[in-house]
UniProtKB/Swiss-Prot annotation:
Its cofactor is Zn(2+). The gene is mutM. NCBIfam families: fpg (TIGR00577), PRK01103.1 (NF002211). Keywords: DNA damage, DNA repair, DNA-binding, Glycosidase, Hydrolase, Lyase, Metal-binding, Multifunctional enzyme, Zinc, Zinc-finger. The keyword DNA damage applies. PANTHER family: FORMAMIDOPYRIMIDINE-DNA GLYCOSYLASE. Gene3D superfamilies: 1.10.8.50, MutM-like, N-terminal (3.20.190.10). This is Formamidopyrimidine-DNA glycosylase. Belongs to the FPG family. A zinc finger (FPG-type) spans 235-269. The keyword Hydrolase applies. One of its GO terms (molecular function) is 8-oxo-7,8-dihydroguanine DNA N-glycosylase activity.
Amino acid sequence: MPELPEVETTKNGISPYLEGAIIEKIVVRQPKLRWMVSEELAQITQQKVIALSRRAKYLIIQLETGYMIGHLGMSGSLRVVEKGDLIDKHDHLDIVVNNGKVVRYNDPRRFGAWLWTEKLDEFPLFLKLGPEPLSEEFDSDYLWQKSRKKQTALKTFLMDNAVVVGVGNIYANETLFLCNLHPQKTAGSLTKAQCGQLVEQIKQVLSNAIQQGGTTLKDFLQPDGRPGYFVQELRVYGNKDKPCPTCGTKIESLVIGQRNSFYCPKCQKR
């Protein structure tokens, strides 16, 4: 599943082709995604793109009359193609702009979304989201207060979008390894120092992943077709039975909250 770095990479990749351009039309080939594609999108014509931004794992395209909001789901990706390029099987939506380019949405599993809102601050899916992990608001004091009396597993806690957005499975695993914290440790048992370390490493891991263009495991590609190279930096995620890069102990895995978790039993003692 594309996580925050992959969505940020996608935003950065398509921004030069969209910002300031005029959308001539939006072609919807398959409206049945996770939710039905908003009917307003097919009616957009001759609208200027004001800006692109991101909230959590949502891509936001600001137009003159409102906002297109995209989510890549489990297998979605956006790529920049030329008008007239062949359409692939899972190409479900095109944003056709006046510079000869098409921003094309591909999603084999159709678990993504394309929605519309006129008022971003009233968009229902954004109302209960926590702070952005790379923002100043997300600091050790905030995480310390949020974690008090929480009996949930630490990894589940970090992946809760009401706590902090965008820390998905890949990057939660990597962060906990770098902090020498077991994924099943209860969130409420964190010390103030551990909260500070977690915040620092979350910011560092996500920033590094963005610089590397995200992580390509199966479906994700950057808008220019290149893979995300952070996959080469993964220390524990997906590395069950491989040696820990720190101590050489075999990496183990377990399921927490229906997600695979990877950790070193020696470096990350519970």
